[in-house]
Amino acid sequence: MGKRLLDKLWEKHIVATNENGLDLLYIDLHLVHEVTSPQAFEGLRLANRTVRRPDLTFATMDHNIPTKDVWNITDHIAKQQLDTLRANCKQFHISLADIGDEAQGIVHVIGPELGLTVPGKTIVCGDSHTATHGAFSALAFGIGTSEVEHVLATQTLWQRKPKAMGIELKGTLPKGVYAKDIILHILATYGVAVGTGYVMEFYGETIRSMEMEERMTLCNMAIEGGAKAGIIAPDEKTFAYVKGRKYAPKDFERAVEKWSELYTDSDAVYDMHISIDVSKLAPYVTWGTNPSMGIRIDEQLPAISDQNEERAFAYMGLKPKQSAYDIPIKHVFIGSCTNSRLSDLEIAAAIVKGKKVKDGVRALVVPGSQKVRQLAMEKGLHHIFEEAGFEWREPGCSMCLGMNPDQVPAGEHCASTSNRNFEGRQGKGARTHLVSPAMAAAAALYGHFVDVRKESYDGAISYS
């Protein structure tokens, strides 16, 4: 019997196996940010240990940064965490993309754009959305702070091998429907626990037609389905994306030869399989307090079926059978490690070009990195957004989570391109609706959700 992509990635990194069936995996890349690392570094100091492979460790600042004025950090805890990361990176000789550095940005955006993320690697970070890097056929997953310390000290991690789930995507996406809608459809259909104990492998003709940034969106939210990780076999688009980046392999042709072996064999069998015809999908919007509480834009909100839904309706201030078009939007956030890359901003800019944000709506565009921001500004996208009434910000995690000044006031609704809509995720009492960049941009113009398929726009972005 053939091997799955998961098998090939896993077996390549086994250092040892213990009597309990756990495998000691070698870690090729450890990404670090300011929130989950302080205790890990302190643990090293208390044990008189050092970082085993600082050359395989890379740090950035993203969660706590105020994106309106990156140097005006007024929160004591945020400032302490940022200062601590600087000190730790200096002491342990770790590369750091600090505030103001041209490489700074959200950890799961800068990894791929710097060429740190390449096929075949094991990648970990003290952040649940590390699964993003699986779009490059890397086995990437989030870890806890104690595990961060273990990787810093040993460059290894004890893990139990997950099962393999195959998700086949067939057909062509309709206009106005994007990778974000695919993953929201999967969550709405199969729930937030479908992937528990699995690694999701996305494959099929739809995947091959996707660009790398769309694939990253899919893998980013595999964790929302309970999966350990999301992975995609590499192809020519993968190789072209990586080629020429700062940390890409020097002997690139040799690397591509090895990477080309990373695929699921034709006679391999998945432990679970799902098949989806994406040509039948529509734009999605979440209405509740977990990512599976989502509907097509042309559907009504559901009837209450259990206590969780009853609580969600009460928290969100919505009613069963209500139309998604009637949800009032006061805030729009285009950003996060899910949808803050150049193609995401281009789509949003195409929607709002020559139009105006609805009175009373606060709309933010937060590029995922300094590089994304620079490229967007070279294309004039910042002018398009600012003339429409959006705020153009500096890179950071921003309104994805309530850890910095970018928050949603209690009781108000936000159309967000982020990945989580839990109670209080964007601030105490905030009401979050997860959507694609196109849906978020359109909501900013109307002050409520609309079917972006009916909007007039194209992908040709220029500013004049």
Swiss-Prot record:
Residue stretches in coiled coil: none
Binding site for [4Fe-4S] cluster: C337, C397, C400
Cofactor: [4Fe-4S] cluster
Iron in keyword set: yes
Record GO biological process: L-leucine biosynthetic process
Pfam families: Aconitase
SUPFAM superfamilies listed in its UniProt record: Aconitase iron-sulfur domain (SSF53732)
The protein's enzyme class: lyase
Protein keywords: 4Fe-4S, Amino-acid biosynthesis, Branched-chain amino acid biosynthesis, Iron, Iron-sulfur, Leucine biosynthesis, Lyase, Metal-binding
Record GO terms (molecular function): 3-isopropylmalate dehydratase activity; 4 iron, 4 sulfur cluster binding; metal ion binding
Cysteines paired by S-S bonds: none
Catalytic activity: (2R,3S)-3-isopropylmalate = (2S)-2-isopropylmalate
Quaternary structure (record): Heterodimer of LeuC and LeuD.
Name this protein carries in UniProt: 3-isopropylmalate dehydratase large subunit
Name of the encoding gene: leuC
